[in-house]
C-alpha cells in the first residue's frame, strides 16, 4: 500500500528516501541501479534496503474500492 515510514526491523526512517528512490530507479528514462541509488542516499542496512526495493505502490489500484 503506502511506503512505510520506518523500517520494520530496526526502526530507522526510510520513508524520506522513497520519492527519490522511485524517481531514479523506476520512473527515469534510463533507470539507475538500485544498489547505487541506495548507497548514495545513505541507506546502509540490508533490512532498510529491502523496505525500499521490495515495496509495490498499490494505493492507486486499491483506492477505487474504498
Curated annotation (Swiss-Prot):
Keywords: Cytoplasm, DNA-directed RNA polymerase, Metal-binding, Nucleotidyltransferase, Transcription, Transferase, Zinc. It is an enzyme of class 2 (transferase). The keyword Cytoplasm applies. Binds 1 zinc ion. It is found in: Cytoplasm. Its EC number is 2.7.7.6. Its main location: cytoplasm. Its cofactor is Zn(2+). GO terms for molecular function: DNA binding; DNA-directed RNA polymerase activity; zinc ion binding. It comes from the Archaea. Zn(2+) binds at residues 7, 10, 47-48. It catalyses: RNA(n) + a ribonucleoside 5'-triphosphate = RNA(n+1) + diphosphate. One of its GO terms (cellular component) is DNA-directed RNA polymerase complex. The keyword Cytoplasm applies. It holds the Pfam family RNA_pol_N. GO terms for biological process: DNA-templated transcription. DNA-dependent RNA polymerase (RNAP) catalyzes the transcription of DNA into RNA using the four ribonucleoside triphosphates as substrates. Part of the RNA polymerase complex. Belongs to the archaeal Rpo10/eukaryotic RPB10 RNA polymerase subunit family. HAMAP family: RNApol_arch_Rpo10 (MF_00250). This is DNA-directed RNA polymerase subunit Rpo10. It comes from Haloarcula marismortui (strain ATCC 43049 / DSM 3752 / JCM 8966 / VKM B-1809).
